[in-house]
C-alpha cells in the first residue's frame, strides 16, 4: 500500500522494468550496483529501497544518507523523497546554501540526509551530523562523483558510516570500484544496454565554416521554432554567454545555466525551463546529467565534448523515459571526433527563418512560501479570486521555503500585478514580482 501511495504522490501509475527489477532484487544481505542510462528513473528505484528500510523507532537519528555529485541533483532527490507517504524528515545539504539555515535544520536530526560531498564533510567536521546509526548509504551518480574529483571526500564520509546496506548508481560502466568501499555480496543490475532503455534518438549534423557557425546556430534555433524545448551545449561558459548575447540582441527568450552563476540564478533558470517560460536553455556539461528536466525535444551540441561519455550524458537529457528526441551536432568541416562513427544525415537550413515567437507562459514570484504554510492550491485560489483570471491561465507552481514561483500566461501578467499585489495569502501580505 505504501509503494502504491508513493507512486500516486509522484504522479506515476506503475514502475518501469528496471525499477521493478531493483525492487525485487533488493535483499538486505546484499549491496547493490545499479547501472542504468540517464533518465531511466534511478532516483525512484533507490528511494523505494530507502522507504522499505526506514524505521519509526529510529526517529531522531539519521537512517539514510544519499551522496550526490551536484547540488542540482541533490535538490531533485530531495523532492522525490519528500513525496513518501509517511512524510519522513528530509534535509538537503549543498554548497551555496545558507550554512546557518542548514545548521538549524540539523538540530533535529532528519531521518534522511541528502547532500554533496564537500558540504556533508563540513557538517561532519563540526559535529552537526552523526552518521553512526546509518542503515542505508546511497552513492548516486557514483561515476560522476569520481569524475569530479570527490574520491577523497567520499572516502572520508564512508569511513564515518559503516552502513549495513550500500547502493551505488551509475549511468556508465565502472572500470573499478575504489577499495575504500567495502561491498558485501554485491549484486549488479545492468540496464545500460537493454532495449527500450537506450534513448530513442535521431541524429542530425549541421556543418559550417568556423566564421559561419553562429549564423548556422541561429538558423537552426529559428527552424526549430518556439514549441521545441531545446538544450544547447557548449564546452565553456564563455561560449554560453556569447551565444546568449546573440539571442538577446534578437529578443529571443532563453536562459543560461553554468557554474559561473549564483545558485539562486541557476535554480531559477531550471525552474523557468521546466514550467515552459523559456524553451531554450544554454548550458555547459553542468546540465548533462542528474537534472530533472522533462520533455526536452532537442539537444544542440554547439561544441562537441572531448569524451564520448560526456556526449552520451548530454544526449540523455532528451528521449527520457522512452520518449523520443533529436540531437543536432554542429560541426566544422575539419572536425574529427573518434566517437562519431555512424553516418548521420545533414540538416538542411534555408537562408532565412522567422524568429521564434515568445513562449505562452512567463514566471512570477510570490513572496510567501512553505514557512508561511502556503500551498499550490492557495496560490491558484488567490489568483483566480483576487486577479480574476481563469484557472487555465495558471501553469506549473513551485513552492519554496520563503517564496513561490508560478507560471502564468503572458496575457494575464498585467492584471495579476495590478490586482494581486499587497493582498494576503493565508494571512501573509504578499508582493508579486516578475522573475
Give the ranges of each region predicted by the language model.
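Post-DEXD/H (motif II) to motif III coupling segment of the RecA-like Helicase ATP-binding lobe
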Residues: 122, 130-194, 340-343
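Conserved pre-motif I regulatory segment
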Residues: 1-35
Amino acid at each position: 500500500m505504501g509503494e502504491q501511495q508513493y507512486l500516486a504522490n509522484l504522479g506515476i501509475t506503475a514502475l518501469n522494468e528496471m525499477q521493478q527489477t531493483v525492487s525485487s532484487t533488493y535483499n538486505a544481505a546484499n549491496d547493490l550496483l545499479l547501472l542504468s542510462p540517464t533518465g531511466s528513473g534511478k532516483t525512484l528505484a533507490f528511494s523505494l529501497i530507502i522507504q522499505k528500510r526506514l524505521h519509526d523507532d529510529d526517529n531522531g537519528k539519521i537512517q539514510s544518507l544519499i551522496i550526490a555529485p551536484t547540488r542540482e541533483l541533490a535538490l531533485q532527490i530531495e523532492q522525490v523523497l519528500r513525496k513518501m507517504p509517511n512524510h519522513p524528515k528530509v534535509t538537503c545539504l549543498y554548497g551555496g546554501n545558507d550554512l546557518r539555515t542548514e545548521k538549524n535544520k540539523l538540530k533535529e536530526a532528519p531521518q534522511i540526509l541528502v547532500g554533496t560531498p564537500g558540504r556533508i564533510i563540513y557538517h561532519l567536521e563540526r559535529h552537526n551530523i552523526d552518521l553512526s546509526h546509518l542503515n542505508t548509504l546511497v552513492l548516486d551518480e557514483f561515476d560522476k562523483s569520481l569524475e569530479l574529483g570527490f574520491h577523497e571526500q567520499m572516502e572520508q564520509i564512508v569511513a564515518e558510516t559503516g552502513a549495513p546496506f550500500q547502493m551505488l548508481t551509475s549511468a556508465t560502466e565502472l572500470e573499478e570500484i575504489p577499495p575504500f568501499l567495502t561491498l558485501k555480496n554485491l549484486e549488479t543490475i545492468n540496464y545500460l544496454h537493454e532495449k527500450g532503455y537506450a534513448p530513442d534518438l535521431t541524429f542530425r549534423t549541421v556543418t559550417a565554416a568556423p566564421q559561419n557557425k553562429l549564423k548556422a546556430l541561429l538558423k537552426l534555433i529559428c527552424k526549430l521554432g518556439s514549441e521545441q524545448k531545446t538544450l544547447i551545449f557548449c564546452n565553456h561558459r564563455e561560449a554560453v554567454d556569447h551565444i546568449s548575447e546573440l539571442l538577446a540582441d534578437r529578443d529571443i527568450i532563453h536562459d543560461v545555466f553554468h557554474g559561473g552563476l549564483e545558485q539562486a540564478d541557476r535554480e531559477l533558470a531550471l525552474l523557468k525551463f521546466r514550467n515552459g517560460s523559456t524553451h531554450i536553455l544554454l548550458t555547459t556539461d553542468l546540465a548533462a546529467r542528474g537534472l530533472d528536466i522533462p520533455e526536452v525535444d532537442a539537444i544542440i551540441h554547439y561544441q562537441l565534448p572531448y569524451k564520448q561519455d560526456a556526449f552520451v550524458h548530454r544526449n540523455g537529457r532528451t528521449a527520457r523515459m522512452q520518449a523520443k528526441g533529436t540531437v543536432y551536432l554542429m560541426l566544422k568541416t575539419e572536425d574529427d571526433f573518434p566517437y562519431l562513427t555512424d553516418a548521420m544525415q545533414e540538416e538542411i537550413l534555408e537562408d532565412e527563418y522567422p524568429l521564434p515567437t515568445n513562449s505562452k507562459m512567463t514566471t512570477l514570484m510570490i513572496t510567501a512560501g512553505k514557512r508561511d504554510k502556503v500551498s499550490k492550491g492557495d496560490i491558484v485560489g488567490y489568483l483566480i479570486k483576487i486577479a480574476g483570471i481563469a484557472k487555465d491561465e495558471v501553469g506549473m507552481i513551485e513552492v519554496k521555503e520563503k517564496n513561490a514561483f508560478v507560471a502564468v500566461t503572458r496575457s494575464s501578467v498585467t492584471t495579476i500585478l495590478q490586482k494581486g499585489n499587497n493582498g494576503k495569502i493565508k494571512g501573509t501580505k504578499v508582493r508579486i514580482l516578475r522573475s
